[in-house]
Structures are given as C-alpha cells and as structure tokens.
Amino acid sequence: MQRMFMLFCFVNMLAAFACYTFVTQELGLIFALVNVLVMAETVFTYPKVGLSEMLYLAFINIYCTWLPLHMIALRLLDNGAWMLMSVFIMVWICDSGAYFSGRAFGRHKMAPHLSPKKTIEGAVGGVLLTIVSAVVIEQFLPLATSMLHTCLIGLLVAFGAIVGDLFESYLKRSFGVKDSGKILPGHGGFADRFDSFLLVAPLCFYYFSIMQG
C-alpha cells in the first residue's frame, strides 16, 4: 500500500510538469488515468485497502499535488512570472517578519501545542510587513487595480503563509517527525522550506484570475 501511495504521488508530480509543458489537456488525461488506476487497485484488493487508506490517499493528492500545481498555474497567467516571484518575496518577508517580530515582541503563544516558538505578536508583525512589501512591490510591478486590492493581496499572502506553516507543523507532530525530509541539508525537507507557499499559491492564483477577468 505504501508503494502505491509513493507511485501515486510521483506520477501526479509528473503531471505538474506536464501542466507546465503541455498546458491542460495532457494534464487532465494523466490525472484521469492515475485516479482510475488507483480506484481499480482499491476495487480488486478489497478489503485490503479500506476507507481510511483512501482518505489518506485523497489528502496526499490535495496536499502534495493539487496545492503545488497552483504555483505553475500562477506562472501561466499574464505576467505570471513576475507575479510568482512577487508572491515568493512576500512569503519570505512574512516568514522573516514573523520570526524577528516574535523574537523582539513575542509574549503570547499562538499555537503552543504545535509550534511553541510562534507568537501572536510575531504573526501580526509578519502580516504588517507583508502588506508593506505588497505596496512596495506595486510601485515596480502592478499587482492590482487599486491600493485596496494591493493590501488585500498582502493580507491573503500573510494569512496563507502563516496557516500553511502551522499546518505543516501539525502534520509533523501527527507523524512524529522533526523535519519533513532531508532533501535540503540543514534545512529539513521540501515542505519545511515551502510549506508557506502551498496555501498561498491557490489563494493568489484565484485572486489574480478574478482580477484579470
């Protein structure tokens, strides 16, 4: 069953590259084939594969594939490369701002059972600095049609980054691991560096899509 999970994730991540290279039709076909094969596996191995395993598989599909795909989808929008880079910058500023604000002013724990070092004051500092960074970026690269929309983009990025970081901490606590892997030596796994982007990407993609009509 574990090998099936790993194969499922691997093929779906290949679908992400198909999305970037071949746009939408081939991606849809790959997803359809993979999911039909997984359903066939559950049918012919029942009751070996139960509902809990299928729900786990669905979560993997969402968290490891559907959410990251929005980074590529964001890149494919008009001025997508600049938008994606701007989002990355804002997320990094949010993370750094929350860290240093928490170190300087942190008093009240935000989620003590998940991440004892994160504070409400740190989160507020991260949000404010992200909004400021969105306004600064707007001077060089138009992100929105008004200052209000620019501030909303900064707020969305900060909200998604903070929740994404906490959710990855929740996953690590649930699975009893310190880091999500050793892909990046000294920095933990892939998710330890990019957890904040996973929820920000879909928020920004749909927001920018609505603004572009």
Regions found by a protein language model. Name each.
Residues M1-L155:
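Membrane-embedded alpha-helical bundles of polytopic integral membrane proteins
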Residues L57-T65, L141, L166-L171, A201-F205:
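A short, terminal or domain-edge coil/loop segment
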Residues Y206-G213:
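Juxtamembrane boundary at the C-terminal end of a transmembrane helix
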